[in-house]
């Protein structure tokens, strides 16, 4: 996907530096000259001002990577940047003006009039492999529904290549043909979502392939391209079901069709469905392949429920293989890769009776119902956190600005070094 070389706020902001005043003495000021906007930018601003004076207003895209009212990029591959200006017209409908610079002077070459009340998002990709960038625009119709339009910029024609309803979309090479496709998720009816893959033939005629997502979806959570265990690309969509469960749909291109690899044909819901909805699919081991979480409820020592998470890799035929099992403490922001054999009979309890200190104790449940403690993980805050992390029997796992994590082995067969190497922090990931 082609990305912008740079982005800009409305061009008028370029003049702000001229108006800034400092606290330097006159003797120092004489050696400094505030940056001056070029005549080219001033002339572009004049063109934009004409639009604004006619009743238009800036209307930047509300989602996605490109959210500035004015964006600069080389759309036609000539090495020169064009300016895209995102506006709302006097009638309230959104529009996009494209300005071309010729001999250091801008002129408007294209206006794209949209639908709805705003511009949801924009993106850029060469979908027909003609060497030119195509413009992808999601015109926002309602809170969750967009009209997705793809425009050719050849000779600045603005030819509409594709138009379809969309809830979310992205671009990627799902069929491994070296060309990018548009992958669209759309809400067909309440609880029913479809995934559509659009390709553009050499004659620019769109071709579509579709597959159903899990039934009963309440709302989409995350969407991205991932790599499967056999190296195949896949589209991964994670959603909340209407009962609060989390589900992961994995879609792949197989034998000329778009296939939902994880969908159970009997239930109409992915086999990745889980009531523990705090952990999302990710590359948990850092090998470049996505793993899908399958939580397993642990034996409860009290009222609070705890879960271990088995992580599975999938290939393009939907075959799954266990990669690892973890215990995720989302509350304290860490997880532990469980050593071999720990997942069977594991039980967990939390102890937080010491101010500024929370302990999570992982134990093994005996066949007679007895509990044998293995290791404790401490999350410690407060001014004396370092001292408490180094109390007798404890070892430091990780130190951050206001929090320290420490461990304590409670079984002689457990190696502290193994716990240290298996301890990881939980960091925020992507979202739709």
Predicted features by range, described:
Residues 364-384:
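A short acidic-to-branched-hydrophobic micro-motif
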Residues 414-415:
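Histidine-centered catalytic/metal-binding microenvironments
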């Amino acid at each position: 996907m082609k990305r912008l070389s740079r982005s800009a706020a409305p061009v008028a902001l370029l003049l702000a530096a001229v108006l800034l005043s400092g606290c330097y003495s006159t003797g120092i000021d004489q050696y400094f000259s505030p940056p001056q906007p070029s005549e080219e930018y001033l002339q572009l601003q004049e063109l934009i001002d004409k639009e604004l004076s006619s009743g238009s207003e800036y209307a930047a895209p509300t989602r996605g990577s490109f959210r500035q009212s004015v964006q600069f990029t080389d759309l036609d591959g000539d090495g020169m940047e064009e300016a895209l200006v995102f506006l709302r017209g006097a009638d309230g409908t959104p529009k996009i003006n494209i300005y071309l610079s010729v001999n250091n002077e801008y002129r408007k070459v294209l206006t794209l009039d949209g639908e709805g009340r705003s511009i949801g998002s924009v993106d850029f990709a060469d979908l027909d492999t003609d060497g030119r960038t195509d413009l992808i625009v999601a015109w926002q119709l309602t809170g969750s529904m967009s009209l997705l339009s793809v425009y050719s910029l050849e000779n600045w024609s603005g030819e509409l290549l594709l138009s379809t309803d969309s809830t979310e979309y992205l671009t990627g090479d799902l069929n491994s043909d070296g060309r990018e496709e548009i992958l669209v998720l759309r809400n067909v009816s309440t609880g029913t979502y479809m995934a559509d893959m659009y390709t553009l033939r050499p004659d620019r005629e769109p071709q579509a392939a579709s597959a159903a997502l899990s039934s009963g979806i309440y709302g989409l959570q995350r969407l991205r391209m991932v790599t499967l265990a056999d190296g195949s690309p896949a589209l991964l969509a994670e959603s909340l079901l209407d009962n609060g469960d989390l589900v992961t749909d994995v879609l792949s291109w197989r034998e000329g069709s778009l296939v939902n690899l994880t969908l159970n044909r009997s239930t109409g819901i992915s086999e990745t469905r889980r009531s523990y909805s705090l952990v999302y699919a990710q590359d948990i081991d850092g090998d470049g392949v996505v793993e899908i979480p399958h939580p397993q409820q642990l034996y409860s020592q009290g009222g609070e429920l705890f879960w271990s998470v088995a992580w599975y890799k999938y290939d393009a035929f939907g075959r799954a293989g266990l990669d690892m099992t973890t215990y995720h403490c989302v509350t304290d922001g860490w997880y532990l890769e469980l050593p071999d054999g720990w997942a069977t009979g594991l039980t967990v309890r939390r102890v937080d009776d010491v101010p500024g200190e929370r302990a999570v104790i992982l134990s093994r449940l005996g066949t007679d119902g007895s509990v044998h403690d293995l290791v404790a993980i401490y999350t410690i805050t407060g001014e004396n956190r370092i001292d408490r992390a180094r109390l007798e029997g404890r070892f430091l796992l990780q130190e951050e600005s206001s929090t320290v994590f420490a461990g304590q082995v409670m079984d002689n067969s457990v190696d502290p070094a193994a716990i240290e190497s298996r301890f990881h922090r939980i960091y925020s990931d992507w979202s739709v």
